[in-house]
Amino acid sequence: MFRNVRLACAVLGVLALLIGTSASAQETKVKLDAQNNSGESGTATLTPAGDSTNVVLDVKGAEGTQPTHIHKGTCATLDPKPSFPLSPVVNGKSETTVKASMKDLTSGGYAINGHKSAQDLKTYVFCGDIKAGM
C-alpha cells in the first residue's frame, strides 16, 4: 500500500513539474532599457493567446500617459512606422493583445518602445529588443 502511495506522489510531482515548465516556456520576457536619459526601464511580458499575443508592460519611472508600440527593427534601428500599437503606459502599466503570433514576434526583428508623450513622439523613453528564439 505504501508503495502505491509513493508511486502516486511521484507521478503527481512529475505532472506538476511538467505543467509548470510548459507554462513558463510559453512566456517571454523582454528587458526594457532607458532611452534618452529618461530613467525609465522595466519588463515586457509576452504570452501566447491563440494566433495573437498578450503584451504586458511594467515600467518603472514612467510618468503620465505614454504611447507604446512594437516596431520592426531593433532599438538601434527602429522602423519609424509602428507594426503593432500597444495600449499607452499609464502609471507604469500597459496591457494589450496584438494580432501577431508569439512565433512571429519572437522570430527576431521587432522591438518594443515607449514615447515621452502623445505630444512628443520623437523622444523615446524606453526600448527593448524582442530577440529571435526568446
Predicted region positions:
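N-terminal leader/targeting pre-sequences
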Residues: 2, 6-9, 15, 19-134
